C-alpha cells in the first residue's frame, strides 16, 4: 500500500531525474570529475571555488596528478585559523611519493578575500619547491 497514487516515470523524466542527481552529487562534493585534467589555474579555481567561498578558515589542499595532469587524488593537508594554516613539506610530498604521482599542485584560500600572497605564503612555497626538487619534482612556480 502506497502513500499516494502510483505513477511511472517515463524515459525523459527518468533521464532528467538521473541528471538532477548527478548534478547534486557534483555540487555536494564541490569538485569536478576526480580524474579531471588540470590545464591551468582556471581549472583549479573551478575545482575549489565553492569549497573556498564558504570557508571561514584557511584550508590548504594538495592535488596529486598523473603524467597527463589528471587528478589522481586530492587531500586536505591543513585547516588553520582565519589567516594561517600550518603546512610541512612531508605532509604534502609524502603522499605524492606513496601514490607515485608525477606532479602535484597546492592551493589554499584566503578567507579575508584578499588574494595577495603573504610573506608566509612565499616562504611555504619556497620550502615546498626546494623539498620537491630534492625528490625529483619539477617546480613550475610562476
Describe each PLM feature range.
Residues 1-3:
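Long, highly charged, low-complexity intrinsically disordered interaction regions
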Residues 24, 28-48:
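Long, charged amphipathic helices and adjacent flexible linkers at domain junctions
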Residues 60-64, 141-142:
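Short beta-strand scaffold segments in enzyme catalytic cores
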Residues 79-120:
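Short HxH-centered metal-ligating active-site micro-motif
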Residues 126-142:
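Divalent-metal-activated hydrolytic enzyme cores
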Amino acid at each position: 500500500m502506497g502513500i499516494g497514487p502510483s505513477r511511472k516515470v517515463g524515459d525523459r523524466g527518468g533521464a532528467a531525474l538521473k541528471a538532477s542527481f548527478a548534478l547534486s552529487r557534483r555540487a555536494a562534493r564541490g569538485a569536478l570529475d576526480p580524474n579531471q585534467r588540470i590545464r591551468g589555474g582556471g581549472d583549479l579555481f573551478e575545482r575549489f571555488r565553492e569549497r573556498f567561498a564558504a570557508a571561514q578558515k584557511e584550508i590548504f589542499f594538495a592535488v596529486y596528478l598523473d603524467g597527463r595532469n589528471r587528478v589522481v587524488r586530492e587531500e586536505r593537508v591543513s585547516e588553520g585559523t582565519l589567516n594561517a594554516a600550518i603546512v610541512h613539506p612531508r605532509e604534502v610530498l609524502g603522499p605524492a611519493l606513496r601514490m607515485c604521482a608525477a606532479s602535484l599542485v597546492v592551493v589554499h584560500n584566503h578567507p579575508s578575500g584578499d588574494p595577495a600572497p603573504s610573506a608566509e605564503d612565499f616562504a611555504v612555497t619556497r620550502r615546498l619547491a626546494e623539498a620537491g626538487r630534492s625528490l625529483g619534482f619539477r617546480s613550475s612556480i610562476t
